[in-house]
Amino acid sequence: MAPTTRQPAEQPHPPDGGTTPAAAAAAVGAPHARGKGRPRSAAADQAILDATREALAELGWGGLTMGDVAQRAGVAKTTLYRRWPSKSELVVDAIASLFDQLECTDRGSLQADIEAVVARFAELLTLPETQAALLALFAEGSRDPQLRLRIRERIVQPQKVLVELGRANAQARGEMDPDRDPATADEEIGIIFDTIAGTVEHRLLVSGEPVTADWIRRFTTLLLGPFPGLLR
C-alpha cells in the first residue's frame, strides 16, 4: 500500500509506531549507510545537505559547486569530498534526506494512510529547493545512467519499502488479502508507487496545479475505486 507521514530524519525513534525509510531499508536488507572511514558528524552532514538544497534553489544544478556548498555549510572541501565524491551523489542524498521525512504510520484504514502520505509528499514537493533539485535530477538522470541508478537506490527504493509496509498494515487489518506470490506482490507495489508518486509529481511539477485536501480525497477514491470495501 502507500507510505504515510514521518518525522524528520534526525529523530532516531519515530513516534506512533512509524517506520522511516532508513529503518525500513535495514529491515529488508537494503543498503543505506556508506562505507567505512572516519566517524561521521551528523551535524556536519545535515549542514551540508541543507546547504546543498539552499544552493540548488538559488543557483540551479549548473550553478551549484562543491566549493560553494562547503562554504555555505561551514566545512572544509576535503570534508565534503570525503563524504560525497561527486556533485550528483551529493544532490541525490540532499533530496533523499527530505523524503526521509515520510513515515509509514498505521492510521486505521488504507484510505487514511494514502491520504496522509499524499498530503505530506505534496508539502515536500512544494518546497522551492525540492522542485529545483528534482527537476535538475530528472534532466541529468536522463543522460547519466549511473545517476539514474543512484536516484533509484536512494530516493525511489526506500519509498517503495514504505509502500510495502503500508500494504502489510492493510493486510494485518484485514482490508487486503495476504500476498500469494512474492513476485506479483513486488510488481504491484511498484505500480502503486509509480501511480501515487507520478500523479502527484506531475500535478505539482509539470501541470503546476495545487494538491488540495479535496483533490487528495478524490484521487484516493479513484485509486481505491475497484475496491469499494476499502473506502470509508
Label each residue range with its predicted role.
Residues E89, A94-I95, T126-E153:
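Amphipathic alpha-helical segments used for helix-helix packing
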Residues A132, P145-R173:
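Amphipathic alpha-helical packing segments from all-alpha helical-bundle domains
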Residues L102-Q131, A185:
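Hydrophobic alpha-helical connector segments
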Residues M1-R72, E89:
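Basic, helix-initiating cap at the start of DNA-binding domains
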Residues M1-H32, E164-A168, A172, H202-R232:
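C-terminal peripheral helix-coil segments that are non-catalytic and often amphipathic
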Residues R83-W84, I151, I155, E201-H202:
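Tryptophan-centric aromatic hotspots in well-structured domains and transmembrane helices
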Residues I48, G63, S86-V91, Q101-L102, ...:
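Short amphipathic alpha-helical segment with a characteristic S/N-K-E followed by hydrophobic residues
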Residues G74-W84:
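Short hydrophobic/aromatic patch on the recognition helix
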